[in-house]
C-alpha cells in the first residue's frame, strides 16, 4: 500500500521554489511507500505536471493556515486514502515508510489570556475552540510532516473556526482526530545553521530536516544540493535549463558576491599577519612557553 503526499504551496518562496525541489528529491530517495504527489496552489516553472498532480489555487486574504486548509481540502478529493501533508521546507533524511509516520507533537498547557503575538494568538483561538467542545489540546504545530485522514479533514473543513478566526492547522486537525503526540528526532534550522561541516554532521541522525527563510542561508542551500543531487521525476525533463547550484546560491551570476575590502579589514589583516610572523619567529619552543604563560 502506498501513501499519497499533499503539498499546499504558496508564492512566498525565498529560493525560486527550490525548497520544493529538494523536498521532492528527499521523498524519492528515502520514502519506500511513496504514492501520488499532489501539489495545490502555485506551480513552479520546473514542475513536471505529467509526473505529479497539480491543482491550481490562488491564495486568499485571511492567513497562512486558512489557505493551507483550503488547499488540503481540495486535495482530499484526489487522494487514494490516508495521506501525509508536507511543506516545501521539509526534507526526509533517512529511509522510512509513511505508513509508520507518527503525529509529531507535545502536550501543551492551557493558555491564560489571549497573547499579542500573531502565532500565539492563533494557537490561543485554536485551544479555546477545542476546550469549548471538550476536546484534548496537544500542540501538533512542530513544522513536521503530518499524517491525515481525508474523512476527518473534511469534517474539520465543515467547522467555522478556521473560516471566522485564525487557527493553526496541525493542532486543530490532530486534536479533532484524537492523535497521540509523539516527540521525534527532528532537525530544525530556524536561524543560520553555521558552517557546512556542522550541517553535514547534524543531518546524520534525525529523520526530518525542517527550516524557514532565516535558516535557509547559502550554506544550507549548498548542503541541500550536495545531499540530494539526483533529479526527481517531478522535475521537468527540459535539460536546456542549466543545473548549477551556484546560480541558486549566488543568484544569476555564478560568481560569489564578495564585499570590497574596507580600511578596517586591511588593518585587521595586517595585525593577523604580524601576529603570525612573530609566532613563526620565536620557534616551536617559544610558542610552547607562550601558550604556557597564557594558560597560567
Where do the model's predicted regions map?
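Active-site nucleotide-sugar/metal-binding loop of Leloir-type enzymes
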Residues: 70-82
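Active-site regions of enzymes building and remodeling cell-envelope glycoconjugates
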Residues: 47-67, 71-72, 98-106
